[in-house]
Amino acid sequence: MSASNCLRCLVRPSAVALVPRQMLQVGGGSLTFTATAATKGASSANTGGRQNANRPQKLRFKKTKKKNVVSSGKPPLPGERKAYRKKIVLSNNNALPVPGLETLRPNDLAKQDNVGSVKALPEDVVDALRAMEAFKPTQCWGIFRQPSVLIRQETVDLTKKMKAAGADGKTIRMVIEGNRVTGKSLLLLQAMTHAFMNDWVVLHIPEAQELTTAVTEYAPIENSPLWTQPTYTLKLLQSFKRANEKVLSRMNTVYSHADLPQIIPVNSPLLQLINSAKEADGAWTVFQALWRELNAENVPGRPPILFSLDGLAHIMKVSDYRNPAFELIHSHDLALVKLFTDCLSGATVMPNGGAVLGATTRGNSPRSASMELAIAQREAEKAGEKEVPQRDPYSKKYDDRVEAVMKSVEILRLKGVSKTEARGLLEYWAASGMLKKRVDESMVSEKWTLSGNGVVGEMERASLLTMKA
């Protein structure tokens, strides 16, 4: 019996367990104190009573209004951000004037003796290049006193071919290829500079992606599978007029055009024909009439034409536009793109001679398997290799229309500059006050090696990156 009674004592709740834990902690302390009635009343008023200490608090879901943030300035106007993003600064008055810097003359870019030298662009050519948007925001024009260019061996080779084509009435069709920041866009700028100084007519598309990424208006052409882009065409006509006004002022019309927005008699100034495009709706008709006038055969005074485009890969694919059946439109079905690809492939002949140049890009560029294959094939044929690259039989990314355009073009591959050209560039940077080191053989070899054997953009990054605004 005693054992059962002991077991009952073990399971019976003890008096100590019924005491709250807080009271045990307070009572078990070694400190003893007394409190007056006033202190006890204040304590109970502050804590709400000891009996309510363990009660759960109620959650309050009261919505609090956020304070309105007062704007410190007005929002940017429409187009202001884009204008700031595309802003081009071509001079810096704080930079030192380079002593002995010569200005380019019409034949300087085609002279072999000028390889490795830096020459300044004439002011009228700078205005024309700015009108055609040949300068890029990523180029470091704004840290020098005036815009100048380095004459490379590829520059001389290209301008010599342009000079011969203009004299013989032939057309060179070339694609400028190269790795990132090797100077492809700058070589296009030098070709345009040579054309402006020798009284050529220059038509330039600065960003091919603006034609194919569905960022501009488009409309179908009646009785044709092609599509026009009236707003972009009007903008192109206006920039073409500003850049070539000196040459166009000496030319008159030789054909009558019935579809123009206004009547233009025969033998009228060609500028009057361009000025007739006041609205976007009639821009494509005016552009067709202008192209016909510029390519008039057996007409004295018709200059050669330079037709150039930057960002070639963007037009060598299916565009982002859609037809009424919601099918994607191929880039070669856009009228402006079709004109350039016909000139590049040789389907459209320019009787007065000239050049058709397209430059590839590595920044923000889509992959075009057919274009890359065609470039590799043309380079293999030029090198005389027995095995020419062929299509991947398991890939469906090839485009017959792209390969037809690139079938007979010439490829100019840009690589790094030579050490002689690198020395001329570094000496110009040092004379401008941008390079605070002595230019000698060891320094030239160091910069040339660090830049991947003379890649111009990497040389700029290694030497002038801290000087950029």
Curated annotation (Swiss-Prot):
It is found in: Mitochondrion. Coiled coil: none annotated. Component of the mitochondrial small ribosomal subunit (mt-SSU). Mature N.crassa 74S mitochondrial ribosomes consist of a small (37S) and a large (54S) subunit. The 37S small subunit contains a 16S ribosomal RNA (16S mt-rRNA) and 32 different proteins. The 54S large subunit contains a 23S rRNA (23S mt-rRNA) and 42 different proteins. One of its GO terms (molecular function) is structural constituent of ribosome. GO terms for biological process: mitochondrial translation. It holds the Pfam family DAP3. It comes from Neurospora crassa (strain ATCC 24698 / 74-OR23-1A / CBS 708.71 / DSM 1257 / FGSC 987). This is Small ribosomal subunit protein mS29. It comes from the Eukaryota. One of its GO terms (cellular component) is mitochondrial small ribosomal subunit. InterPro entries: Ribosomal_mS29, Ribosomal_mS29_fun. Keywords: Mitochondrion, Ribonucleoprotein, Ribosomal protein, Transit peptide. Component of the mitochondrial ribosome (mitoribosome), a dedicated translation machinery responsible for the synthesis of mitochondrial genome-encoded proteins, including at least some of the essential transmembrane subunits of the mitochondrial respiratory chain. The mitoribosomes are attached to the mitochondrial inner membrane and translation products are cotranslationally integrated into the membrane.
